[in-house]
Amino acid sequence: MRKTESQKIALCGVLGALSVVLLLVGAALQIGTYAAPMLAAFLLIPVLDEYGPKYALLLYATVSILSVLLVPELELAFFYVFVIGYYPVLRQQLARIKSTLLRWVIKFAVFNGATVLVYLLLFALLGSAILDELLADGVGMLAALLAAGNLSFWLCDRAVGALTRYYRLILKKKLKFLH
């Protein structure tokens, strides 16, 4: 079955709405600052696989704008916008690099650079309150948080790969209306 523009827009709209709801729930429960953006990013996988990076990036941009406007927790919204929301698309593009070491160096450089950018933006917008919160338990705790963040990112990368394979091998066959 040929994919019409209406079908593409409908799927993107549904997954975009679900992404925003996940971000809102993460903010409301105040436990999903990092988990909710990762879950929302996973919803790009079907769009990326079915319609390509153009539609996936349009979905990401739409969810990003809506999250900044609607999600009350700025850190959560920024984490989606700058750190993890686009990652499934970036991961697919980086898969073209033959060297595994170079690929991982780029992935971690992008993740850490984007994370630093988020906190610099939060510092610029919220003032020293964010810095005081980060340094409240000392520099050692900040280093431990950065290490935990990198471990979480590595797990997220593994999850994106596993979910992409699961979608292609199992879900795609069950969701015949997408293709």
Named regions from a protein language model:
Residues 73, 108-125, 150-154, 158:
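Mid-bilayer segments of alpha-helical transmembrane spans in multi-pass integral membrane proteins
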Residues 124-138:
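Membrane-interface helix termini and inter-helical loops of multi-pass transporters
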Residues 81-120:
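Short helix-perturbing small/polar motifs within transmembrane alpha-helices
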Residues 9-14, 35, 57-61, 77-78, ...:
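Hydrophobic alpha-helical transmembrane segments
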Residues 2-55:
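Hydrophobic transmembrane alpha-helices
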Residues 24-33, 64-93:
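Interfacial aromatic-anchored transmembrane helix boundaries in multi-pass membrane proteins
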Residues 4-5, 139-179:
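Alpha-helical transmembrane segments and their cytosolic interface
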Residues 40, 59, 63-67, 83-84, ...:
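Transmembrane alpha-helical core residues of multi-pass small-molecule transporters
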